[in-house]
Amino acid sequence: MAEEVGETRGGEGKEKTETMAVENKLKERKISWAKLRRVDSLNLEAGRVSKTQHNNQVNWKKTLSLTFQSIGVVYGDIGTSPLYVYESTFPDKIGSKEDILGVLSLIIYTLVLLPMLKYVFIVLRANDNGDGGTFALYSLLSRYVKVSLIPNDQPEDTQLSNYKLEIPSNQLKRSEKIKEKMENSKNIKILLFLVTILGTSMVIGDGVLTPCISVLSAVSGIGSLGQDAVVGISIAILIVLFCAQRLGTDKVGFSFAPIILLWFSFIGGIGLYNLFKYDVSVLRAFNPKYMFDYFKRNGKQGWISLGGVVLAVTGTEAMFADLGHFNVQAIQISFSGIVFPALLCAYAGQAAYLTKFPDDVSKTFYKSIPDPLYWPTFVVAVAAAIIASQAMISGAFAIISQSLSLGCFPRVKVIHTSAKYEGQVYIPEVNYILMIACIMVCLGFKTTEKIGNAYGIAVVAVMVITTCMVTIIMLVVWRTKMIWIAFFFFGFICIEAVYLSSVLYKFKDGGFLPLAFSFFLMIIMGIWHYIHKERYMYELKNKVSREFIRELAANPNINRVPGIGLLYSELVQGVPPIFPHFIANIPSIHSVLVFVSIKSLPMSKVALEERFLFRQVEPREYRMFRCVVRYGYNDAVEEPQEFERQLVEGLKEFIRHEHFISEGGDAETVGEPENPQSSTLLAKDGKARASAVYIEESLQQPNPSRVSSGSIHSNSGIKSTKSSNGIISAPLQGSAAEEMQIVQNAMEKGVVYLLGEAEVVAEPKSSLFKKFVVNHAYNFLRRNSREGGKVLAIPRARLLRVGMTYEI
């Protein structure tokens, strides 16, 4: 027994020694709280980001599953191109057999250079934490270079776990000079923004042109009924397609993939059949000599025909835009192993058929199908066309949703149709506008040849924009060697410039349509973003002074009412100018008041545990806080009850930590969790809280097992315990517990949302153009867009509005 007591005392002495060692390290590593709280920082919590290693590696089974799904989502558009490429390339007739070989050679090397080399092996790597598309490129660039037109950057944002991309090379003076030039030039920022919204507008325009050309081409298989009947049937299919959008595409990957895979099997198999039956010698087209000979023979007409050849790569941008649903390896495997071989066989087979029947060029695809397979192929072709249309329509919805998050599009209703597939959204207003536009295009153009003229411009324009933006990313983000940047830029821009010049030649024959549509969208997006920026600048210049808050705290006429008030503003720093208007109209304040700013970051997603930032608004006893809620452009806004729960849990954790800092004296540091995978605090329901405690310093503990089960005594006599997830925290002092209980009681009394309705007008001294843009164009868009409360998912029964006029 004595031995046991001795061992126990010895253990206690050893534990005490270890505890003192821990305390000494805390003292050695202490951080001055006064120095840490920068003017531009919200709180210490902003600097505590998850140390979780984001594992982007996916096992081969998951990759194969994603590969299969990607076939149905990504390749419908490029897969249906064989329906109309030869018809668009030879609108009149085929001059000679050598011309067929020349066009086939052009198609082969266009497929090799643009989709395969450029996109599959280069552009896909320029993703924004797994997301692709023009906005993703802009967002990626915005995180490395301050090119955003809205000055709401915070140091805390750069510390998010998804914010930074690992740079593959050493820093170079060249990239720093380019970065400095871009950050200091307002014109470059505006140009980059305009190029971005031009690219997104073109992709949205594809949501109109793809359904038209794909469905018309597929239905043309029953051309014996006459062109008017084909147009009528196509319009009926399109109406059904758009009306079905509200049902969602939850099973899009697995349900569409078998059909598109069957389609590629059909076109590849039929192509091989025609190749061996009619003329296997067309494989000579792999020799680029036939491509150059084609231009020598045909001159200007050969150049014009490139507008049809480029349709072979329609849908290439979808590989990049839809990357967020899959991964790079899945796209690379599916394109290289299935799509590319099937397309080569299809085009080679059609070329072999045309060498024997050149007069059938206007119906190449259907004429080349063996009779027993005609109707099965027709059915699968219509299904593939619908799927291709579906993918582009869904892509248009996703892009507009991203635009909304970045303040570049009027507020519209966004419905998330899938809990499983992120980014699957439905926008009713946009859906019916696209449907009407599709019907008008079908009625106006009637043939795939004219629609192809319009389609080509949209396809090539987006490719040119992608080339330019990836080049900038190579310079600034990747810091690639100049020789490789030169090869990439000049190699692809020359090819795309030739194609662009060809499709622009057909401007009057339908090419004006995507440009007009994109210009219209750019005006809407530009006006909305401009006012969004100016509103933010107005609030920043007119934010409430600290003296006003102090006077308010001392004002006996201001009543405190039970509950939590959430006052929404776009400001990430300071108290918004709408607050005095609330006080003037309603001379009372809730027992807990939180100034909430919804901030969209230039990244696809923000982890839930990194979403909330808090800071106390002095005086402390007044219980006023600021909160920045950060979302990525693919994040969905939570339901009110869940949002309130997350915010209150985060606020209580902030209060706990504030008291730990203020009461801890020298021990102003907390330790690193032993397991970085579990750095979030857990609520009672076992779910990660929205606002987690993150660690600033690593603490090497002499005996983790003993420390985790025991206590650490600081010099002040305060006992701090170490939780199961490795976080050393102080026990709640009376004031902290009381304040947290006040917050909890206030939540139980109810949460009220306070929303300022700003009427934006131009200053009297503004130009006539600015007055028209602000007073008429913007206000027309605002009146016809969705209310801010609905966009933020604020329950109407608990919403209080106060109006104010902003002169910008």
From Swiss-Prot:
Signal peptide: none annotated. One of its GO terms (cellular component) is membrane. It is a multi-pass membrane protein. Induction: In roots, induced under potassium starvation and salt stress. Expressed in the roots. Residues 699-722 are annotated as: Disordered. Residues 1-65, 124-189, 243-251, 324-327, 401-424, 478-482, 532-808 are cytoplasmic. This is Potassium transporter 5. One of its GO terms (biological process) is positive regulation of response to salt stress. GO terms for molecular function: potassium ion transmembrane transporter activity. It comes from the Eukaryota. High-affinity potassium transporter that functions under low potassium conditions. Involved in the positive regulation of salt tolerance under salt stress. The chain crosses the membrane at residues 66-86, 103-123, 190-210, 222-242, 252-272, 303-323, 328-348, 380-400, 425-445, 457-477, 483-503, 511-531. It catalyses: K(+)(in) = K(+)(out). Keywords: Cell membrane, Ion transport, Membrane, Potassium, Potassium transport, Stress response, Transmembrane, Transmembrane helix, Transport. The gene is HAK5. Its main location: membrane. Residues 87-102, 211-221, 273-302, 349-379, 446-456, 504-510 are extracellular. PANTHER family: OSMOTIC STRESS POTASSIUM TRANSPORTER (PTHR30540), POTASSIUM TRANSPORTER 5 (PTHR30540:SF94). InterPro entries: K+_transporter, K_trans_C, K_trans_N. Belongs to the HAK/KUP transporter (TC 2.A.72.3) family. It is found in: Cell membrane. NCBIfam families: kup.
